[in-house]
Amino acid sequence: RKISQTISKQILSHLEKMAKDDAEKYNSFWKLHGKVFKLGYSDFVNRDRITPLLRFNSSAMEDADGLTSLDDYISRARESQKEIWYVAAPSREAAKVNPHSEVFRRKGLEVLYLYEPVDEFALETLAKYKDYTFKAVEHADSVVLDAFADTDEQPKAAPLSNEDMNEFDKLLETIRKVRDGERQRRA
């Protein structure tokens, strides 16, 4: 048991150093061994050392290969944000089109994308990281989300030209004639 604890501590120290000093190398390690490593969420003795080493794709990443740590997510979090939001999906494309993700996109709030079944289970078991609570986008509180301003500005429609106005007037007149014709047929 003592040997196991010592080896675990040495491995975690090495991984912490690699994650800090050579993020690219650590991300390569993560892509190969991340699925197995995530099972470490159940190691209560080392949980505080394992959690910062977890990596996920997120809405802030340019593509599905990008990875972020929970600390990096927190560094990008909006002021007064107290949740780490996530969505479980089989792919990045599915996560992006999830209807619950729309409000987060509109408000410029980052969402972690969880592709593996163990991801969601791990975050639910961890429940918190630092002062942030893990929360699935489908369980987000609308009152909390309403506190964040929309970042996507809706494009303003260009003013209509006189020619366009004339075309709309013709269309409106045609609609009125059709509608009047329908009324006469029903009568």
Language-model features: locations:
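Conserved GHKL (Bergerat-fold) ATPase module
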Residues: 1-187
